[in-house]
């Protein structure tokens, strides 16, 4: 009966009676989770490739509870989602936000995924659009609210910069940034940073300008530093209090415009931008208070500079005002007394003139005594002696005055006297045609003898003396010998005629000398011998000095010729 034991101990086994439902029950769910995990990993890899997720997010989402398969759905519901509308922002800003590179940069900075949703619509299209058709917006998704806040703040900053650029280049009313929240039980709202207000739906950015008004300030007063404060602490305080964007722009602000690459042409001003008009007004009030304080500081600065400078007219030069040492500025007071100092120099030249005036009268008497002395010898002998010699008959004064004049024997008074007759004293033709060898006619007016010597002798006697008398013994005397002859003493009636001629000529008569004789010794000698030579000792060697008797006057060949100037002679 052993046969029945095994039969009783076990029944016939079939494929349906295989034991393993317990093991299969435990292994079946495991295979489904693995498959789900593989699909999730593939999806995560795709998101990472697109930049939508980060590896850290995948690792945090990998562990899944095996107890319930609803854990993944719960994790998905915990994601925070925000939507920022960019349909109405400026075109440049909208193009920048829709670029994949910009969205990747926002994802790296904030840790939240950013993607573009919807499409661009105009105002008319918005009014006619269906509820399912939404305008252009950015979809931001993150695991925590902080990550989403970072992404939204970054997007808002980009939009603000775009609004500012549009405001500087053209008038722009403002951009509408709408933040959408995904309704969920776990995340009712998306709070922002504690110091910034919440993002209400449909807010508009408004802006304003507050001009500083210190464009003409001195260089020593740094307006930019006074407005911004140490490390821009003043403007940062206004931003923290009002949530507005406040920064300095314009000339001297150091803010370069993106379009031109240089500062704006407008005067320095504070640019204010805020989503709400109330916040803009409060920020503007704070900026005005700040500028009032800066103006008060500048007034004190000017007062200080004016107190340092004695002359307020020189307040403007910044270099002088900026010098730290004050004593040099008090020194100009010392220069002021020096200004009268240049005035005395003009009087000193006048002072020397006064001493010069008294000195001049003192020496004046001696010059007065000398003045008559100097002109008298110059004029008296020439003017007084000549007329004085005319009235008296004494021949001595004229003879004494003649010796100083004889040195001018080369002046040839015959020429001057003969100019009245129109004849020259030189030979102008053959000797036989001149008067060198013949005596003068008795009654001719052309005879001109030496005024000093021939004045006392008649014309006939003078001519005969010239032809018959031998020459003087001393040839050196020349002219003085003939005037001193005793037989030629002048007579009163004959004296006046030569004196008148001397008065007219003002020169001493020329009686000739040995040099003149040598020029024409042949003809003169023949003439003398023809007239007769009484001296037996009249030797040929005496002939050269003898011709002094010949006057250097040229007589016309015909005594009846009419007198006329030589330049009018035919």
From Swiss-Prot:
Domains: entry comment: The C-terminal part is necessary for the interaction with the PRP19C/Prp19 complex/NTC/Nineteen complex. The KH domains mediate RNA-binding.
Biased composition annotated in UniProt, kind: Pro residues: 391-407
Recorded GO CC terms: cytoplasm; nucleus
Protein name as annotated: KH homology domain-containing protein 4
Alphabetical GO biological process terms: mRNA splice site recognition
Gene label: khdc4
Region entry Disordered, spans: 1-29, 391-410, 438-500, 512-570
Similarity comment text for this entry: Belongs to the KHDC4 family.
Domain of life the protein comes from: Eukaryota
Species of provenance: Danio rerio (Zebrafish)
UniProt function note: RNA-binding protein involved in pre-mRNA splicing. Interacts with the PRP19C/Prp19 complex/NTC/Nineteen complex which is part of the spliceosome. Involved in regulating splice site selection. Binds preferentially RNA with A/C rich sequences and poly-C stretches.
Keywords, ordered alphabetically: Cytoplasm, mRNA processing, mRNA splicing, Nucleus, Phosphoprotein, RNA-binding
Sample GO molecular function, one term: RNA binding
UniProt xrefs under InterPro entries: KH_1_KHDC4/BBP-like, KH_dom_type_1_sf, KHDC4_KH-I_first, KHDC4_KH-I_second, PRP5/DDX46/KHDC4_KH, RIK/BLOM7
Domain KH intervals: 77-157, 210-292
Signal peptide (from-to): none
Listed Low complexity bias regions: 553-562
Region (Required for nuclear retention): 427-497
Entry's localization field: Nucleus; Cytoplasm
Subunit structure: Interacts with PRPF19.
A Pfam family the protein falls into: KH-I_KHDC4-BBP
Predominant place of localization: nucleus
